[in-house]
A protein has these predicted regions:
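Short, well-ordered coil/turn segments that N-cap beta-strands
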Residues: 1, 31-34, 59-63, 107-109, ...
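Caspase-like (clan CD) cysteine peptidase catalytic core
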Residues: 91-93, 97
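Short, well-ordered beta-to-alpha junction loops that form the rim of enzyme active sites
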Residues: 40, 114-117, 175
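Divalent metal-dependent hydrolysis catalytic cores, especially in the metallo-beta-lactamase
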Residues: 4, 8, 24-44, 110-112
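Core dinuclear metal-dependent hydrolase active-site scaffold
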Residues: 86-89, 105, 111
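Charged catalytic cores and adjacent phosphate/nucleic-acid-binding surfaces used
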Residues: 1-5, 9-13, 17-26, 46-53, ...
Length: 240
């Protein structure tokens, strides 16, 4: 079963242009059976699904609850908690990485760095926390090894880390636009129905594979050097 494990929907991420229903339809057309909603520091996109769509449409498609968390010191971290576990603290950006990992694990969840070899401040290996505490990578449950919006060298670096530290590698599109949806995915040997199913598969380190194709129309590709200013703005925002 293929799942896009890095999805931003309009109902939850202010920088996404894709409503969750369009996301689902596009994924279905590509033969992908599920998605992990990972909006920035909010579960609002998933709440929209749960409150207005779930059980009424797309009953053969799996929508899972996740989040892309903005840490104080280590960039963006993908988090999955068991269904039924409500963690409003995860919607308050800015926890330091070590505290975040302990909090997630204490409550039965898993976490891993998004695009770990990507942009400065946003990606774990390009932060001061990695330089000061590289051993923290051992505490991750997985590493995102394919992100459709990252360049090949970034994903290759992530794959190297996953192999070096014995972590499962996940994949996702990181889509904010419709034409990027489904360009990255994680493939599991069994069907995933719930967040707990996903957590178990990753913890068991089964035959999980990541893959996809590269998306070359990202905002950072278009705006060039101005992207560095935006990245610094993200860092400053998380310091607030």
């Amino acid at each position: 079963m293929k799942i896009d494990m890095h999805c931003h929907v309009r109902e939850g991420s202010i920088d996404s242009k894709v409503p969750i229903e369009e996301f689902i339809k596009k994924l279905q057309s590509k033969g992908i059976g599920g998605m992990l909603v990972t909006d920035h520091d909010t579960y609002n996109g998933y709440r929209h699904w749960k409150n207005t769509i779930k059980g009424r449409k797309y009953k053969d498609f799996v929508v899972l609850k996740g989040i892309e968390y903005d840490t104080l010191d280590a960039g963006h971290i993908l988090i999955i908690m068991p269904q039924g576990v409500k963690m409003r603290l995860l919607e308050l950006r800015g926890l330091p990485l070590s505290l975040l990992i302990d909090f997630v694990h204490h409550n039965g969840g898993i976490c891993g760095p998004a695009h770990p070899c990507g942009e400065k401040y946003l990606s774990f290996t390009n932060t001061k926390r990695w330089q000061k505490s590289p051993e923290l990578i051992e505490k991750f449950d997985f590493i995102e090894t394919f992100n459709a919006c990252e360049p090949p060298q970034s994903n290759e670096g992530a794959k190297y880390l996953a192999e070096k530290y014995g972590k499962p590698g996940t994949g996702g599109s990181d889509a904010h636009k419709l034409d990027c949806v489904g360009m990255g995915y994680t493939e599991f040997p069994v069907r995933i129905e719930t967040e707990l199913d996903l957590i178990r598969q990753i913890r068991e380190k089964g035959e999980i594979q990541s893959g996809g194709e590269y998306y070359t129309k990202t905002t950072k590709d278009k705006i060039g050097k101005f992207n560095k200013l935006l990245i610094f703005s993200f860092w400053f925002y998380n310091r607030g």
